[in-house]
Amino acid sequence: MAKVREVYQSFTDSTTKTLIQDEAYRNIRPIMEKHKLSNPYAQTIEAANDLEGFGIATNPYSIELHTHAAAKTIENKLLEVLGSLLPQEPVTFMFLKPRKLNFMRRNPRIKDIFHNVAIEPRDVARYPKETIIHKLAEIETDTAYISDTLHFLDPSYIVETFQNCPKLQTLYATLVLPSEAAFKMESTHPNIYSLKYFGDGFQYIPGNHGGGAYHHEFTDLQWLKVGKIKWRDPKDGLLGHLNYTHEQVDTHTVTVQLQESFAANHLYCIRRGNMMTPEVRTFGQPDRYVLPPQIFLPKVHNCKKPILKKTMMQLFLYVRTVKVAKNCDIFAKVRQLIKSSDRDKFSAVELVYLVSYMEFLAALQATTCFSDTLSGGLLTKTLAPVRAWIQEKKMQLCGLEDYVKLVKAVDWRPVDFSFKVETWDFRFTQLGMWKAFQPSELSDVEEMNNFFDDGDLLDCFTRMPAYAVNAEEDLAGMRGNNQEETSTAPREPEGEKKEYINPAETFLDKLTRKHNRETRSRAAKKAKRLAEIQDSMNRDRTEEGSHKTPNMGEAPSNADLPGVNEVEAGTTFPTLKALPQKWEDASSTDSSTIDPTEIIPGEEDDKAATQKVVVGLPWKHWLPQLNAVGFKALEIQRDRNGTMIMPITEMVFGLDKEEFPEGTPEALARELKAMNRSPTTIPLDLLRARDYGSDVKNKRIGAITKTQAASWGEYLTGKIESLPERKVAACVIHGAGGSGKSHAIQKALREIGKGSDITVVLPTNELRLDWSKKVPNTEPYMFKTYEKALIGGTGSIVIFDDYSKLPPGYIEALVSFSTKIKLIILTGDSRQSVYHETSDDASIRHLGPATEVFAKYCRYYLNATHRNKKDLANMLGVYSERTGTTEISMSSEFLEGVPTLVPSDEKRRLYMGTGRNDTFTYAGCQGLTKPKVQIVLDHNTQVCSANVMYSALSRATDRIHFINTSANSSAFWEKLDSTPYLKTFLSVVREHALKEYEPAEAEPIKEPEPQTHMCVENEESVLEEYKEELLEKFDREIHSDAHGHSNCVQTEDTTIQLFSHQEAKDETLLWATIDARLKTSNQESNFREFLSKRDIGDVLFLNYQKAMGLPKEPIPFSQEVWEACAHEVQSKYLSKSKCNLINGTVRQSPDFDENKIMVFLKSQWVTKVEKLGLPKIKPGQTIAAFYQQTVMLFGTMARYMRWFRQAFQPKEVFINCETTPEDMSAWALSNWNFTRPSLANDYTAFDQSQDGAMLQFEVLKAKHHCIPEEIIQAYIDIKTNAQIFLGTLSIMRLTGEGPTFDANTECNIAFTHTKFDIPAGTAQVYAGDDSALDCVPEVKQSFHRLEDKLLLKSKPVITQQKKGSWPEFCGWLITPKGVMKDPIKLHVSLKLAEAKGELRKCQDSYEIDLSYAYDHKDSLHDLFDEKQCQAHTLTCRTLIKSGRGTVSLPRLKNFL
């Protein structure tokens, strides 16, 4: 599977991954449905893992609760297995509820028989009344089943059942017996059940639910070993067999075999006849346990509890490797190895025995005391066996040598859940003598003191069976008994042979006594299931409130809109109608146009003036149609080129005006005639229909249609292809957005009401809901999305609204497929965007849009709008009568609460991932009407068609805000002026320093942690594994032909050789580092990359802005804060030593090129644990030296933005900058959630991966802080034109820039929030490229589209936040006790300092770092795992032995 998994993980294409996931889901569904019967419950993660080990799947989304869900699931699974074994004929079920037949998938028509006896009071409620009997009747079927009862029965029950039921051949039985109880162990499946032991037995508690518990005696465990049961014919008495031989006895046998076993639940098959059965019966054992030998006297002082073999081996190797294993050291080691959650499973006495045993092993010599067979001559080798025999006899007389003691002491006995199958022979033993074979009952005190004197529980268990005895030995023993004892032996009960004697009498008595002895109560009934979420799709949606806009009142509801009066015949000019004060809903769609209200005409002179104007209008003959849709149309308007705008365009003449088909509602026909939209017959293009049908059949397009059966697709294409031709009456209505194309139709539908044979087909679900809202008095199924209409059928009249957004060929295919369609009505806009098919394989991708096909059947185009104001509409070439001025603005900032229009669907998904759910594409916004919209301009805008741009620009009624996130290219080419020397560019500013950090008041001193002790460890235990794989020096060094080998592996000390020493003078390493870390380019390519990544940079900034709580509007520039930040930067620089300032003279000179960078190799010791002893030396790191004024300028910029960032950042975000470990620890204790897994993030080549996208992000961030434009342009210049001796560098981050730390940190935050969907309130800590979160967030869906465009690649590390697994951040572990240095990394660094002989120089620093962990003392056992404890102990001992320490050494001396 590892190879297969590796292949699957190598797939990076999102489409391929989607296909794999779809295929996997199709396979998962039937499997989950199969397991739903036996496991419908909500399980814990641990229980689900255990169940999967038994082959039982768990639905992670199940919410059905149960008090012991895992145990009940196993019970159900066994019933399912049993159901597959039972014959399809009547079966007798005993002690079973009839409803459990469902789990067996049993046919209810089979007339099964139920025999249930009410043994306990709760059985009356458990079993249906009709299935309860007073005595178990004779079984008259071939097969029977006993449910979860056999473990309480005597063997006599099986004997008498088969003896008195001659028809019975097979008896299945389930029983619940944990095999580990034979060793008095804790439950091996604690997530399923637990065990409690008492003097006479134990209690099995499913799911820790006391109400489902029941008591077992240890003798019940005999059922785990039974293989055969034999008995004699009952016609003769017991004594009558004494004179018979073994062969003369009439023998009856049943064979018992284990059919299936899950945890403590087992299914037995008991078959009449003497058959073969395995000699050994094995039960599941998840872990390997051992028992130490009994070597101490009295035996009570030996280890009796089985212990994990792994733990025993760890303890044994520990005591044999340390120099002196003290008693306290061994106790400390035991504490490390035993999990905190498992400590309650051990008694203190057992731990004392275990430690004493290990101390005994530590004191013995492990060198053999015997001679070898290789030394000596012939005589010596000949006498060697004799000498060995004498030595062995001598040890028997005088005592064993240490070596022999050690070998015998470590001869651990494995605890195996495999038992030898036994035969229970009753031919010569009374059936009533079951109790004689039980162990003698002891009191609790006696059992504690004496039970193990004769051996452990395993021995007792193996002695308990008395039914596996040899028959001849039993017979001889019985003959030896005196006659008096034999004559008084109890006889079998007598009675009529044909009458069935109830064999459950003993069983009833036994359970009655058990019930009286136990004091437990039944738990509450199973918790109620969660109420199902009701489907709200059929509810009436609450009508949203409309927006109020200037010069535009509140929109009226559609129900209150007045109708349109027909123009009176015989008038010389039309009746004039005034525009309504309230026209349209600001949130309505294109089809939401409102009828005007009629007003009484004015005075006669007004009529005359109006008549004069009308006569001069080019469209005077179209005024009735224009008035019908709410336009006066008395004004001549012109576009920006001075061309007159005609409200009626694209007129088509010569179209026949046909009558409406029969059955067309009168109201609908009347409205269409009023608009001059009479139908005309259209011949459909069947080739377009066939292309669409082919794509649907082959599942190349669509969403819902892909789920249809293949036969449906065949039927669709077959019906279309069978038509020679198809004609249909059609009314084609074209008009601008907001012209009122659909309003008249909606008015007619409201008038028609319910009962019509009309279907409205919409391209989107949003538009369907809009129509349902505006025409509420019709059937909901009248309005359908286009795929639903194709699958579910339509009426005889079909209205296609916004049909340009329907797939090409769809209209033809639907009309051809549904032959009942008589009339189609098409509404759309030929000037707006059309449907775009993204599938390359689709045939319809090559078809022209539907508007081109049907435009020739549209009588005219209504080029007027009620939506846009006149100025904007005229610029778009559209007629409008809305007065006022449309507000146009442009900036790089986003407006809040305003819909955002972007050019690409990819950008839309990314923006929605930042929380901007009201984001639409230019094309996808068609149908939207809003008072304000903001349009994002990027490099994709220029490739958008005119139709798409018209859709975007015509959405707003009042304001359009353009967002330009790019830099001003003209300003970019302006260079910074030459700067003076250091003494002149250090400006004198007023001493208005930023407010310094004021530490919080000291908290009350907490009570110190209790002292502790950790076991002594081997000095090399941490680094030993790394040294074992260490290669030779020149095998690890980097080699180049020009400069030879590098010199990173130094000295002969293997400890020092683990660490790579990188030196600036190493030429080979320098050039290897340059090749690996630096990439060259040119200024033009860099700037081109910067511009091409604008789409990504603004997404990064929006996520950063949301994460850090920055205000939505730009932050006004503060000169006072800037000067204070500049003063801090200058003061920091001047605080350097005089030598450092003199060394920087070259970079302070005005002759030093502003864009010039000096590159050096950083000298350092590589101490990262993951890089210890690498087979090949890795390249080093570079340091860049910039022009000093450049560093100080951009350092000021970074500090300025940091000042505002700290003012706004949420409390759950911590940036480790100019803070102390105490600050971080206090923050973590207040904000970090330790109850769930956490995520730490690392990156691959973080500095080199910060390309143009990150630069774009930094520019937007600077603009949001209103940094002066000339500084932003200078920063872009230095990033795109940074020059080294090899040429111009590519855009990247360089160590030595002014804002390196702040920029790295902020890029880290932006990337993290762009990639992950981080829940609100999540604690986050950042510093440069390091970060950690207190949860494991999901990756945003939108990030998959962005991932390949970013060079930055993260390496998330998930920790479980439990002992030994805490999130790491900058070398610190974040724990429930606060932050502390990673003990392994601290120890590794300390060992390097010790090996170099420099420990005394830096001991104070190491003691301070160590103190953050050491102060917690005893709590460290709950925080560190074994390896971390080893490193911590060795660090403490090393510092103590060094003999010098002034910080925390006095406290450390108390450690050991």
Swiss-Prot record:
ATP binds at residues 735-742. Disulfide bonds: none annotated. Residues 863-997 form the (+)RNA virus helicase C-terminal domain. InterPro entries: (+)RNA_virus_helicase_core_dom (IPR027351), Alphavirus-like_MT_dom (IPR002588), DNA/RNA_pol_sf (IPR043502), P-loop_NTPase (IPR027417), RNA-dep_RNA_pol_alsuvir (IPR001788), RNA-dir_pol_PSvirus (IPR007094). Coiled coil: none annotated. Residues 1236-1343 form the RdRp catalytic domain. Residues 513-528 have a biased composition (Basic residues). Residues 480-489, 586-595 have a biased composition (Polar residues). Residues 474-499, 513-563, 581-600 are annotated as: Disordered. RNA replication. The central part of this protein possibly functions as an ATP-binding helicase. This is RNA replication protein. It comes from Potato virus X (strain CP). The lineage of its organism: Viruses, Riboviria, Orthornavirae, Kitrinoviricota, Alsuviricetes.
